């Protein structure tokens, strides 16, 4: 069974988002070994942080992210400059990896400051959930639902209309 990880910076604090993610995580269990890895957000003491302070925090988060990726996994970074993909595109990406025999995948959601360039460079794909700005907890919920939707598309189920 294919391993799919969601690596995210920060905790799910909002109960309603966490419940939604938990529901789709449970549903995904029938299609893949789905795992969520939550890494701590590097705290910046100064509310008016400089670009340098933010870059340093992103670098530390990036190191933690890259250390958490399974060896040989296909890394997908969610970022603003990523390619906008449809549910069918995501399903094809997952199916292609599963068929290749090296099916492990890791999807990464960064902190409110985004992702370090080292993660973007290491990623084999960069995708975007769209041009709108989403809170990171909501982005995790949307991504988890889309992963479930992609798996149902690949299984020929009627969930996707």
Give the positions of each predicted feature:
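Short, well-ordered alpha-helix to beta-strand connector turns
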Residues: 32, 72-73, 123
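N-terminal beta1-alpha1 ligand-phosphate binding loop
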Residues: 1-28
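Conserved RecA-like P-loop NTPase ATPase core
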Residues: 6, 76, 110, 143
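S-adenosyl-L-methionine/SAH cofactor-binding core of RNA-modifying enzymes
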Residues: 40-105
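Structured adenosyl-cofactor binding patch, chiefly the S-adenosyl-L-methionine
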Residues: 113, 117-161
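Short glycine-rich anion-binding loops that position phosphate/pyrophosphate groups of nucleotides
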Residues: 12, 80-83, 111-114
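Conserved beta-strand scaffold positions in the cores of enzyme catalytic domains, especially
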Residues: 36, 75-77, 126
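General small-molecule cofactor/ligand-binding pocket signal
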Residues: 7, 35-37
């Amino acid at each position: 069974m294919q391993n799919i990880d969601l690596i995210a910076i920060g905790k799910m604090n909002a109960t309603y988002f966490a419940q939604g993610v938990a529901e789709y995580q449970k549903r995904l269990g029938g299609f893949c070994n789905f795992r969520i890895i939550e890494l701590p957000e590097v705290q910046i003491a100064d509310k008016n942080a400089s670009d340098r302070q933010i870059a340093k925090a992103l670098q530390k988060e990036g190191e933690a992210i890259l250390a958490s990726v399974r060896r040989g996994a296909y890394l997908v970074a969610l970022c603003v400059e990523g390619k906008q993909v449809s549910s069918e595109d995501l399903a094809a990406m997952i199916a292609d990896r599963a068929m290749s025999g090296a099916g492990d995948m890791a999807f990464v959601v960064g902190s409110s400051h985004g992702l370090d360039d080292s993660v973007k460079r290491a990623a084999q794909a960069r995708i975007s959930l769209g041009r709108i700005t989403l809170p990171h907890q909501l982005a995790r919920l949307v991504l988890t639902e889309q992963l479930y939707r992609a798996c149902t598309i690949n299984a020929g189920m009627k969930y996707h209309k």
